[in-house]
Amino acid sequence: MTDTTAPRTSGAVAAGLATIAADGTVLDTWFPAPELSDEPGPSGTERLTAEQAAELLGGGATAAVGPDARRGVEVVAVRTVISSLDEKPVDTHDVYLRLHLLSHRLVKPHGQSLDGIFAHLANVAWTSLGPVAVDDIEKVRLNARAEGLHLQVTSIDKFPRMTDYVAPKGVRIADADRVRLGAHLSAGTTVMHEGFVNFNAGTLGTSMVEGRISAGVVVGDGSDIGGGASTMGTLSGGGNVRIVIGERCLVGAEAGVGIALGDECVVEAGLYVTAGTRVTMPDGQVVKARELSGASNILFRRNSVTGTVEARPNNAVWGGLNEILHSHN
């Protein structure tokens, strides 16, 4: 069964560059090299001098900091400390450091507290020139046109795309817009064009992602989330049940799961198994799918004659991942 526990040290520390709007709102913070630490010190963020920034981030940091008149922001160098990852985030810099820890694969999903993060994240216009305050978009667009530039707004959201901050080794991402910062992608993972990975979610091994991995969902090694498939997350509707897809599982195209799957499970294409789905067992007994949550070696299928959802021993091998698609990431 997929191990979702995340051994880690108590806290974290990192130096980075933060974008500050004219009203003082922190739009983002980029931490190029976050680290876990046993004794990080008290939680908080301090601004760095130019000399400190050059020492901790490299010589290029000196040129990167300062006012950006085009976007109406200031870029500042900071050092953020989290004394304990079990404690909830205290500010925007803290949240961004935790998201970086996930995408740098230093912490697994659910391996730290993310309580209250939405309150610390501003709604930001993510553009081709960098993060911009939403109220300033048209002003920045005009500034760009005045310089012969075209401003492209890729999204207006609280979370940026991961690849603008972290590019994990050994993965393929066909459409970067569909992977949020805070996604955890293990080496060998391929995310195709229709795949999506939310924050505090992702893969723990080689996986094919052609469907949606919702917030809080973890997918085990060797599993395939088929085209258009869905996994129920822990955000919408106040859900708090963690969905774990075990190892060597197949969630077929346009299928979905609202329960945990053990290892070697298959959900046939087009079948959505929610916790309340009534499932007929091999002996004729009818149970709710939640009673099978986490069980291994099960084939979930819909009887094409009666329409009944059935659970059968998964004696057949679905073939596994195509090694050619994952061995050269």
UniProtKB/Swiss-Prot annotation:
GO terms for biological process, alphabetical: diaminopimelate biosynthetic process; lysine biosynthetic process via diaminopimelate
Main localization category: cytoplasm
GO CC entries: cytoplasm
Catalytic activity: (S)-2,3,4,5-tetrahydrodipicolinate + succinyl-CoA + H2O = (S)-2-succinylamino-6-oxoheptanedioate + CoA
Pathways per UniProt: Amino-acid biosynthesis; L-lysine biosynthesis via DAP pathway; LL-2,6-diaminopimelate from (S)-tetrahydrodipicolinate (succinylase route): step 1/3
Its EC number(s): 2.3.1.117
UniProt binding sites for Mg(2+) 2: 194
Keyword Kinase tagged: no
Places the protein is found: Cytoplasm
Top-level class of the enzyme under EC nomenclature: transferase
Sequence positions that bind succinyl-CoA: 212, 227, 230, 253, 268-269, 276, 288, 301-304
GO molecular function: 2,3,4,5-tetrahydropyridine-2,6-dicarboxylate N-succinyltransferase activity; magnesium ion binding
Residue numbers binding Mg(2+) 1: 177
Protein family according to the UniProt entry: Belongs to the type 2 tetrahydrodipicolinate N-succinyltransferase family.
Subunit structure: Homotrimer.
Entry protein name: 2,3,4,5-tetrahydropyridine-2,6-dicarboxylate N-succinyltransferase
Organism: Streptomyces coelicolor (strain ATCC BAA-471 / A3(2) / M145)
Gene assigned in the entry: dapD
